[in-house]
From Swiss-Prot:
InterPro entries per UniProt: Ig-like_dom, Ig-like_dom_sf, Ig-like_fold, Ig/MHC_CS, Ig_C1-set, MHC/Immunoglobulin, MHC_I/II-like_Ag-recog, MHC_II_a/b_N
TM helices/strands, residue ranges: 217-242
Gene Ontology CC annotation, any one: plasma membrane
GO BP, one annotated term: adaptive immune response
Glycosylation sites noted in the Swiss-Prot or TrEMBL record: 103, 143
Pfam families: C1-set, MHC_II_alpha
Cytoplasmic face of the membrane: 243-254
Signal peptide: 1-24
Region spans: Connecting peptide: 204-216
Top-level taxon of origin: Eukaryota
Name of the protein in its database record: H-2 class II histocompatibility antigen, I-E alpha chain
Membrane topology classification: Single-pass type I membrane protein
Length: 254
């Protein structure tokens, strides 16, 4: 299967160096927006907008709507998704022309890397969020699925669009809101063209092993012993202090 990728990228900066390269550009803030389209069965492509490396929104190709990273952003401004959809369509058209008019070498499929971790320290019974971070994605076509006790989970799942790395690969984050329980185990399932088979990244809460009755007894005994020693030592110091004070106040011979 031959696949090709074309990226359309425009970067806006507050201060630009006209003659320097990317590493020579100095800017207070950088806004990045662009499209990514690639040859593949079905309608695949995306339009994203980032500011200082953080995604603000993307255009959902299936739902044909603007998806804000934080709902509050959508209350401050707006973006017509038709603009992003039009740019995606233009990019696909240009891609087909490039493929027909040139001899291209299909890009190699890279094997993505996944990591799963909780957003906050885990406490049983307290709501939390699991994050599946998938990096080194190329081409940007991937399926990320959450499993709880080996069963698919769809409620409480949210994922970002494909975010561009400096080496032109992509990364994506998938979130799962959950309530930690010592009865549940979770897996992040990753499917990609660069993998011979799906990869499962396992996670389960690390619950400290309960202390045995003997251990609890020993700990309590040690604590009591330390407390008694402290009382005895403190009493000795107090007595010595009183004696020293009495001696210093005793009148000497005339």
């Amino acid at each position: 299967r031959s696949r090709a990728l074309i990226l359309g990228v425009l970067a806006l900066t507050t201060m630009l160096s006209l003659c320097g390269g990317e590493d020579d550009i100095e800017a207070d803030h950088v806004a990045f927006y662009g499209i990514s389209v690639y040859q593949s069965p079905g309608d695949i492509g995306q339009y994203t907008f980032e500011f200082d490396g953080d995604e603000l929104f993307y255009v959902d190709l299936d739902k044909k709507e603007t998806v804000w990273m934080l709902p509050e952003f959508g209350q401050l401004t707006s973006f017509d998704p038709q603009g992003g959809l039009q740019e995606i369509a233009t990019g696909k058209y240009n891609l087909e022309i490039l493929i027909k008019d040139s001899n291209f070498t299909p890009a190699a499929n890279e094997a993505p890397q996944a990591t799963v971790f909780p957003k906050s320290p885990v406490l049983l019974g307290q709501p939390n969020t699991l994050i599946c971070f998938v990096d080194n994605i190329f081409p940007p076509v991937i399926n990320i699925t959450w499993l709880r006790n080996s069963k698919s989970v769809t409620d409480g799942v949210y994922e970002t669009s494909f975010l561009v790395n400096r080496d032109h690969s992509f990364h994506k984050l998938s979130y799962l809101t959950f309530i930690p329980s010592d009865d549940d185990i979770y897996d992040c399932k990753v499917e990609h063209w660069g993998l011979e088979e799906p990869v499962l990244k396992h996670w389960e809460p690390e619950i400290p092993a309960p202390m045995s009755e003997l251990t609890e007894t020993v700990v309590c005994a040690l604590g009591l012993s330390v407390g008694l020693v402290g009382i005895v030592v403190g009493t000795i110091f107090i007595i010595q202090g009183l004696r020293s004070g009495g001696t210093s106040r005793h009148p000497g011979p005339l």
